[in-house]
C-alpha cells in the first residue's frame, strides 16, 4: 500500500500543554485524521509524536511519504540520527539527545516501511498540512 501522511505538533507555552495531529491518505485518497495531546510537553515532542502515531496506524511494508513542517523532525530522522547513534545518543556537543525515547520509537516504526521524508512550509497553501495543524491546535484543549 502507498500512503501520504501530513503531521504537525503544537504547544501552548514551551513547555506547556501540547497537541499533535496527522492526516493519513491512502492510495485511493481515503482520509483518516488522528490527534492527541499531553498536559506538559514541548512542540518538538508533539511533532515527533504526530509522526509516530501516524506510522502506528499503517501496516508494515508500506510505501509512505511523510510531510512535516518541522525541520527538527526531517533533519533528525534523515541526517542527525545516524551520528547520534554512533555517538551513543549524544549530540556533536557531547550532550544527551533530547527526546531520545521518541526518536528511538520513530526509528523502529520507519524501519518497518519504506519512508520518504519531505519538508513543507507551515501555515501555507497545503490544505493537508493546514488540517494537521488545525488538528494539533484543537487537540491542545481536548
Residue ranges and their predicted role:
Residues 46-47, 128:
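Hydrophobic (often cysteine-bearing) scaffold residues that line and stabilize catalytic clefts
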Residues 10-17, 52-131, 135, 140:
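RNase H catalytic domain
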Residues 1-45, 53-58, 133-142:
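RNase H-like nuclease fold core
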Amino acid at each position: 500500500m502507498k500512503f501520504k501522511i501530513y503531521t504537525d505538533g503544537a504547544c501552548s507555552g514551551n513547555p506547556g500543554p501540547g497537541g499533535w495531529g496527522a492526516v493519513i491518505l491512502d492510495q485511493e485518497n481515503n482520509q483518516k485524521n488522528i490527534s492527541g495531546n499531553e498536559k506538559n510537553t514541548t512542540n518538538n515532542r508533539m511533532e515527533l509524536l504526530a509522526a509516530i502515531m501516524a506510522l502506528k496506524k499503517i501496516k508494515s511494508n508500506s510505501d509512505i511519504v511523510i510531510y512535516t513542517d518541522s525541520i527538527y523532525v526531517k533533519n533528525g530522522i534523515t541526517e542527525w540520527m545516524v551520528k547520534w547513534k554512533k555517538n551513543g545518543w549524544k549530540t556533536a556537543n557531547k550532550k544527551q539527545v533530547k527526546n531520545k525515547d521518541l526518536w528511538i520509537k520513530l526509528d523502529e516504526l520507519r524501519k518497518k516501511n519504506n519512508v520518504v521524508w519531505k519538508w513543507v512550509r507551515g501555515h501555507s497553501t497545503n490544505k493537508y498540512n493546514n488540517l494537521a495543524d488545525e488538528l494539533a491546535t484543537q487537540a491542545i484543549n481536548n
